[in-house]
């Protein structure tokens, strides 16, 4: 049976066959080759630049070597059958002295290596300890639980430990609440709840008086805080408690205009709530039943009790229901929470889905997820086991889904290969196409809209709900950036503005893992707090250990990258490529590509091969584009097909340098590839390049003939000539995985996955370079070819069509990335190569003009600048 042409065991002659054929046709090296004529002794022929000389050293295996004079390009090009046209490119921005000076002074010391190991172990333990959610005490909710009278009928609290906690945890200023973070709304609410509870139990007179004094002096500060900083349900529960305090005779400033305004807001809100809605289905009103006691039908409300006995996971709301109904499930829930926390309760519990999703998101965005693969899988398996097509909330039995947890879950689960539908977002869309946090409500905040926006970019073809979500959230977030009061409804983060700016500027297809990690290290707050009914913290989400590990790990990896870059620069110079005057020297920018996405230390060889192969695609693209005659280019192509050094003498001098460097490099790559793959790969590499050079040649023929192909004809060839497939197919040999024929069939040139990578790369390249290339005489681009097919449309319309085709292809690429059943590293190679193209050509030709574009800053941040 004939093997597929893409197979590693294709019908390309073996390395030994090539050696024999080449030995007969290269007279300059016949003596050396004959010395190793025995088949058992044959080794691949390779060439080296002689150190400190203009000579090529020809070597056979580990045997002897002979050298022949080789004139540098600037001295003699008289052998050229045509004169190469010199095209001016901006010089390389990253100079040798800078690269050579990188001594990796920030290399991780032995003590830091030990610290990294310790942090990894501690974070693994955090994941293992995730149960129902770790969070801080809520003085407000604890005060409500402390109100419950003993069920035995005695005149005592049922949970005396909670009363004692209130007595022992008043802050120095007389308030109750989270001492770490001051929010007037939060402190006033918690303080009011505590002084009412202590008054009801006729205890803690000193604490009550201090609390009243705090209230009187600080209540006015609420007026200065943004409405978006008001805790959930504040306008419902605060006026109700204020009324209760007045009945108890507490000396509070009830006549403050601001307090009267809050009372008026409560009355207006209650008028807007139809009575039947309260009992029809679970809503966020269940979260604040303690503030609705005068209107609740307690018998009807019990139909909306959660399976765990709570009302929307709120201890305060559940305590209020229990005091009204004596429901045993309510008491069981409160006992369950106190068993976990001892003498206090949080503002909501459990928080199991929220905690797991955000912890996974944290380690992924910080770039340290590779250390926690098993823990991440366990966390996501847990979340998926509680996934609901209506959406999810912060807890597994929460009956009211929210868009924040749902969008985070949809995005992360989808990217990890779980089968989840985007239809889940329809739960949160109103009749006007707007998205909100909860069904039937108009609340939304920056953090939840940011998560919906991030989710919308992992869309599949035909998912209109994702496109609607993208447009809605982009509009909301851009407006939020202009409104200082918009930050934020649900969280107080170190730099949520920075997170939003990054997400809008570098959406999913333009955001590389190392760049996102660098950005999030700067934006991540280990002390971030969230806002529910009160301020609360999530120590397994916001934790200094994550940040410390991220910084140490980033700098460690960066030091490895710097050493690799130095080696690659030496390879470039030793290959004689500094003598080439027709091409771009972009070793650093090209190395940045794999370093930005396959950054892990174990993929060092893959990055090296990726960079070397990519450099050759640039050299040969420049050669075939405008700097070689068609005859010379055909000769070069034939030399590669035959792997034949005898044709070198017929080449122009600079083309000789290209071919010799090419020949040397890929013989070396093939040798190591054979060791890694356990079989010969030279024929495979030759075949990959054969297809590539044929695509280059076809474009050269079009250019010489001034031929403009149809759009489809152009795309078929240009998706190959962009050379991304060549880079990936050769680099894939060095991922540490054995590249089986089965895997190869799913990423070869016939696979949809690779085709989409090439298509999106070609289209984004054309949109940013077609005008400049047209000015240089190029006649074919996606835009020009589409205009040829549709002569009545404008250039702008053609450009927009190309963008549309690209966006659709990127959605299909998402689906291939998620659903392709191959090892993750191969999926990453293909998908991230497509993404890096979107980044490089975001502003313009980011490769050629890198010195004048943001790509320069990305290179610096990824490769040169350590994080502090």
Swiss-Prot record:
Q: Where is this motif: DDXXD motif?
A: 621-625
**Impact upon substituting residue 86 to A:** No effect on CPP binding, but decreased abietadiene synthase activity
The pathway this protein participates in, as annotated, is:
Terpene metabolism; oleoresin biosynthesis
- The record lists Mg(2+) 4 as bound by 402, 404
Q: How does the annotated pH dependence read?
A: Optimum pH is 7.2 with GGPP as substrate and 8.7 with CPP as substrate.
Annotated GO biological processes are:
diterpenoid biosynthetic process
**So where does substrate get bound?**
269, 489
Q: What is the effect of changing residue 845 to A?
A: No or small effect on substrate binding, but strongly decreases abietadiene synthase activity
Main localization (coarse):
plastid
What outcome is documented for mutating residue 402 to A/E/N in this protein?
No effect on GGPP binding, but decreased copalyl diphosphate synthase activity
Name the CDD domains on file.
Terpene_cyclase_plant_C1
Its domain comment says: The Asp-Xaa-Asp-Asp (DXDD) motif is important for the catalytic activity in the class II active site relevant for the cyclization of GGPP. The Asp-Asp-Xaa-Xaa-Asp/Glu (DDXXD/E) motif is important for the catalytic activity in the class I active site, presumably through binding to Mg(2+).
Q: What else is known?
A: The abietadiene synthase activity exhibits an absolute dependence on a divalent metal ion cofactor while the copalyl diphosphate synthase activity is not completely dependent.
Name the protein family.
Belongs to the terpene synthase family. Tpsd subfamily.
The record's function comment reads:
Involved in defensive oleoresin formation in conifers in response to insect attack or other injury. Involved in diterpene (C20) olefins biosynthesis. Bifunctional enzyme that catalyzes two sequential cyclizations of geranylgeranyl diphosphate (GGPP) to abietadiene. The copalyl diphosphate (CPP) intermediate diffuses freely between the 2 active sites in the enzyme. Changes in reaction pH, but not salt concentration, influence the relative proportion of the major products of the enzyme, abitadiene, levopimaradiene and neoabitadiene.
Name assigned to this protein: Bifunctional abietadiene synthase, chloroplastic
Species of the source: Abies grandis
Quick one: which gene encodes this? AS
């Amino acid at each position: 049976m004939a093997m597929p042409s893409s197979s590693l065991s294709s019908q390309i002659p073996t390395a030994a066959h090539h050696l024999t054929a080449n030995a007969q046709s290269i007279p300059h090296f016949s003596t050396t080759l004959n010395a190793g004529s025995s088949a058992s002794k044959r080794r691949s022929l390779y060439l080296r630049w002689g150190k400190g000389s203009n000579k090529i050293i020809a070597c056979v295996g580990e045997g002897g070597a002979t050298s022949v004079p080789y004139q540098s390009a600037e001295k003699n090009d008289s052998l050229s059958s045509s004169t190469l046209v010199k095209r001016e490119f901006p010089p390389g921005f990253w100079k040798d002295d800078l690269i050579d000076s990188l001594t990796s002074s920030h290399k991780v010391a032995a003590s830091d290596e030990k610290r990294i190991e310790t942090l990894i172990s501690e974070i693994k333990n955090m994941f293992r300890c995730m149960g129902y959610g770790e969070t801080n005490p809520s003085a407000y909710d604890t005060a409500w639980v402390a109100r419950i009278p003993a069920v035995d009928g005695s005149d005592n609290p049922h949970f005396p430990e909670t009363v004692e906690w209130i007595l022992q945890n008043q802050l120095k200023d007389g308030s109750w609440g989270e001492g770490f973070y001051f929010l007037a709304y939060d402190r006033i609410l918690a303080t009011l709840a505590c002084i009412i509870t202590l008054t009801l139990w006729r205890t803690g007179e000193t604490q009550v008086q201090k609390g009243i004094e705090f209230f009187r002096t600080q209540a006015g500060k609420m007026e200065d805080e943004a409405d978006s900083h008001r805790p959930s349900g504040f306008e419902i529960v605060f006026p109700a408690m204020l009324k209760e305090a007045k009945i108890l005779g507490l000396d509070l400033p009830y006549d403050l205009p601001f307090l009267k305004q809050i009372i008026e807001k409560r009355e207006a809100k209650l008028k807007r709530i139809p009575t039947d809605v309260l009992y029809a289905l679970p809503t966020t009103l269940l979260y604040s039943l303690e503030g609705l006691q005068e209107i609740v039908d307690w018998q009807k409300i019990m139909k909306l009790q959660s399976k765990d006995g709570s009302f929307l996971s709120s201890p305060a709301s559940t305590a209020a229901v229990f005091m009204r109904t004596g429901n045993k499930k309510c008491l069981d829930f409160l006992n369950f929470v106190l068993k976990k926390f001892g003498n206090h309760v949080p503002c909501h519990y459990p928080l199991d889905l929220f905690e797991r999703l955000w912890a996974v998101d944290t380690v992924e965005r910080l770039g340290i997820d590779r250390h926690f693969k098993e823990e991440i899988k366990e966390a996501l398996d847990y979340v998926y086991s509680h996934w609901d097509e209506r959406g999810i909330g912060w807890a597994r039995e929460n009956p009211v889904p929210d868009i924040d947890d749902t969008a985070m879950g949809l995005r992360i689960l989808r990217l990890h290969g779980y089968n989840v539908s985007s239809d889940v977002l329809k739960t949160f869309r109103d009749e006007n196409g707007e998205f909100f946090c909860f069904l039937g409500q108009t609340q939304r905040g920056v953090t939840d809209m940011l998560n919906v926006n991030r989710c919308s970019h992992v869309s599949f073809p035909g998912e209109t709900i994702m496109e609607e979500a993208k447009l809605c959230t982009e509009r909301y977030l851009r407006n939020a950036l202009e409104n200082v009061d918009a930050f934020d409804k649900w969280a107080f983060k170190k730099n949520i503005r920075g997170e939003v700016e990054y997400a809008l500027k570098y959406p999913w297809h333009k955001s590389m893992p190392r760049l996102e990690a660098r950005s999030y290290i700067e934006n991540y707050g280990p002390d971030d707090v969230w806002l529910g009914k009160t301020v609360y913290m999530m120590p397994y989400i916001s934790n200094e250990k994550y940040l410390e590990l991220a910084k140490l790990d980033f700098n460690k990896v960066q030091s490895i990258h710097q050493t690799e870059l130095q080696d690659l620069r030496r390879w470039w110079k030793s290959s004689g490529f500094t003598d080439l005057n027709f091409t771009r020297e972009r070793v650093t920018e090209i190395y940045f590509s794999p370093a930005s996405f396959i950054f892990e230390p174990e993929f060092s060889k893959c990055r090296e091969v990726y960079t070397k192969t990519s450099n050759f695609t640039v050299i040969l693209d420049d050669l075939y584009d405008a700097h070689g005659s068609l005859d010379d280019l055909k000769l070069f192509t034939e030399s590669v097909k035959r792997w034949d050094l005898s044709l070198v003498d017929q080449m122009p001098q600079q083309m000789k340098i290209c071919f010799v460097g090419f020949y040397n490099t890929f013989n070396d790559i093939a040798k190591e590839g054979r060791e890694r793959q356990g079989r010969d790969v030279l024929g495979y590499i030759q075949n990959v390049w054969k297809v590539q050079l044929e695509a280059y040649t076809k474009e050269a023929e079009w250019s010489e003939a001034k031929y403009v192909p149809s759009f489809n004809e152009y795309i078929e060839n240009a998706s190959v000539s962009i050379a991304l497939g060549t880079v990936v197919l050769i680099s894939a040999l060095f991922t540490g995985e054995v590249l089986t024929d089965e895997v190869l069939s799913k990423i070869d040139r016939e696979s949809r996955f690779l085709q989409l990578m090439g298509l999106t790369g070609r289209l984004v390249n054309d949109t940013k370079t077609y005008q400049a290339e047209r000015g240089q005489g190029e006649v074919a681009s996606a835009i020009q070819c589409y205009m040829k097919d549709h002569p009545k449309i404008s250039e702008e319309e053609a450009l927009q069509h190309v963008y549309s085709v690209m966006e659709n292809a990127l959605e299909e690429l998402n689906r291939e990335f998620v659903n392709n059943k191959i090892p993750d590293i191969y999926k990453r190679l293909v998908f991230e190569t497509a993404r890096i193209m979107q980044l490089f050509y975001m502003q313009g030709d980011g490769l050629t003009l890198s010195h004048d574009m943001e790509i320069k800053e990305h290179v610096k941040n990824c490769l040169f600048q350590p994080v502090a």
